[in-house]
Amino acid sequence: MPQSKGPFYMTTAIAYTSGKPHIGNTYEIVLADSIARFRRQEGYDVFFQTGTDEHGQKIELKAEEAGITPKEFVDNVSTEIKRIWDLMNTSYDKFIRTTDDYHEKQVQKIFKKLYDQGDIYKGSYEGMYCTPCESLWTESQLVDGKCPDCGREVKPAKEEAYFFKMSKYANKLIEHINTHPEFIQPVSRKNEMMNNFLLPGLQDLCVSRTSFKWGIPVDFDDKHVVYVWLDALTNYITGIGYDADGNSSEQYKKFWPADLHLIGKDIIRFHTIYWPIFLMALGEPLPKQVFGHPWLLQNDGKMSKSKGNVIYADDLVDLFGVDAVRYFVLHEMPFENDGVISWELMVERMNSDLANTLGNLVNRTVAMSNKYFGGVVNKTGVEDAAIDGDLKAVVTATRDKVQAKMATLHVADAITEVFTLFKRCNKYIDETMPWALAKDEAQQDRLAEVLYNLVESITIGANLLKSFMPETTDKILAQLYPANPEAGVRDFDDLATFGLRETGLKVTETPEILFARLDFEKDLKEKVEAIQEAQKKANGVTEYPQVEVKPEITFDDFEKVQFRVAKVLTCEAVKKTKLLKFELQIGDEKRTIVSGIQKYYKPEELIGKKLVVCTNLKPRKICGIESQGMIISAWDDKDNLSVLTLEKDIIEGAEIG
């Protein structure tokens, strides 16, 4: 193995334990995993940390709703989050929980240290508080009276609290950002932080709460708990052994400062303003880079349980497989702008990129090797300089192209480079036409060279795919090197060299289909609808019917229609029909009306009720009975129906309008 290029420490934001993560949340851990795997492949000694953020008022309230303790609640959710991360084949080295004993003790020490040196002081605050975001806002910061971060309702809050002196370190942070352009990426996030927060002037930050108990107690003032951001952000140092008393671990000394904090764009303020200022106050180096990635959205916007449009990773994995999901979220996310996910787009990518471009390439290559040479792949040296040279140039250049993209975290572009290699291999098959060469005895050595070139090219491509689709790489190498798949694993430095496969090795006799083509209507539609229906029921989401707006009428037109209160005197079923026959009292007259609602009501249920009827509808005969008006009902597309009744006891005959 080559010598290590040195330590590389990276983290994701720790997931908040308020519920099961959806595919938008899961995107971050897959993105981080692809970066960590690639850095390991390059030769770095990587430490990759993720975990769960487990304190706060929101969790306290959710636990109360569930009838369990906050610790039981976060234990359940943290286990579920870890299950999803493991399902996605993420190669984290540490999964930290903010309820871990070591973390909690260090947070208390950090709080006390900052208090003792005068960076934290006691005061009180008054403002508008957003419980889901656990953020306090002034009236002027609200957007249409709601939280500027999430758009939810806020409520007035006033309590005693400890505050951190943010303004003390603001100029130092501004200088750091200006002299380290790589610190905040993409650049648009940097501009946002400078212009919206730092340059206008920082307010001191509330770092404790007394209105709830589920948090780390301030040990010298146990009425207070440490506020979420000072608690959560410090996981990045406590997780690798930071000690506020100066006895930090060798691991901490090796890996800090972090090379990369990978977070969602919605929490970049906390990571590029609050976090570096906390570190400055502690006398610790700042992380080298904070990358605020975009969101993965549904077609109709950000995923939300309240919208009923959530897609979960495990549902996608059940239908498409882990690597197909990894490919999709990595490939579809631009560097800076939000990406979009839908079931239909997943099928499109599955068929065009995975089944056709990659799966078909591997299957054809293995099948032809078996058909023409009994699976033995030999290098004969019989080349077409132009065609073979172009293939080799593309293949050997791909490593450096992928590396350049990954260096700037353009992961979607990096994976596209790998698939460009596979597309070039498919073109090579069309150019060389192995089936035609096979018919000419004099071209057998040329045919063997063509198949060797294909197997070698796919081997290099599969190695470069490893960071993004690790299971698929293993499956490809198992088919190309069935006797010893490890023989197909290349050192990163060798991935720009063509021809390292030993001649005479066999491919598998039974090629495996890597990705099967799917038809959304035939294969998935019913399953997807069942998943969506189950989620809506579980989340209590109401699916509203689409409202079809009929042509407008004038007020004069509306006034022509007369609605009145009618009391049901008698009601009976009309035999051999769907009708109920009503005798109604409407003011001083009685009327007969029939209505096709027999399947929804028993006659006795309606006797004595007061209904809404249209009284000036021209009478018509229905099944031989003259109906002198219409009973007004509401119905939906699920075959539910309800006659309109009155909230208060209004005399029959009263006009409605």
Language-model features: locations:
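N-terminal catalytic cores of NTP/NDP-binding nucleotidyl/phosphoryl-transfer enzymes
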Residues: 2-77, 96-111, 116, 133, ...
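Hydrophobic, well-ordered secondary-structure elements that form the walls
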Residues: 300, 418, 454, 470-472, ...
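Helix-rich, typically C-terminal accessory recognition domains appended to large enzymatic cores
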Residues: 122, 345-382, 394-501, 507, ...
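Intrinsic disorder at enzyme termini
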Residues: 476-557
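Phosphate-backbone binding interfaces of nucleic-acid-interacting proteins
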Residues: 540-657
